[in-house]
């Protein structure tokens, strides 16, 4: 049975983890959200989130975006390549409803799977 938990080892926790991804990322994005990814040697994917107050003013909106992103990652974790991902929210992401945000994330995860197979 496949575990769909979201333990600590699936998260990017330190600034050095984020810097590693920002150095040579593979990008997949929409006008509202970008996912940067870089292959890791851990054998499983990890995720980090950046939702700036500058782009999403209200705390409850930032929390909603992070919650939906984590849930999308948690459900797809076994299909994703062994990469470190950083999800960057841009202006306008707060205007998306939950369904539109989830669909955008699914599309970006699929694109990263294709990018990983191609490299």
From Swiss-Prot:
Protein name, as recorded: Ribonuclease P protein component
Keyword Disulfide bond: no
Similarity comment: family membership: Belongs to the RnpA family.
General function of this protein: RNaseP catalyzes the removal of the 5'-leader sequence from pre-tRNA to produce the mature 5'-terminus. It can also cleave other RNA substrates such as 4.5S RNA. The protein component plays an auxiliary but essential role in vivo by binding to the 5'-leader sequence and broadening the substrate specificity of the ribozyme.
Gene name of the encoded protein: rnpA
Catalysed reaction equations from the record: Endonucleolytic cleavage of RNA, removing 5'-extranucleotides from tRNA precursor
GO CC list: ribonuclease P complex
Listed NCBIfam families: rnpA
Record's subunit section: Consists of a catalytic RNA component (M1 or rnpB) and a protein subunit.
Top-level enzyme category: hydrolase
Keyword terms, alphabetized: Endonuclease, Hydrolase, Nuclease, RNA-binding, tRNA processing
Keyword Lyase: no
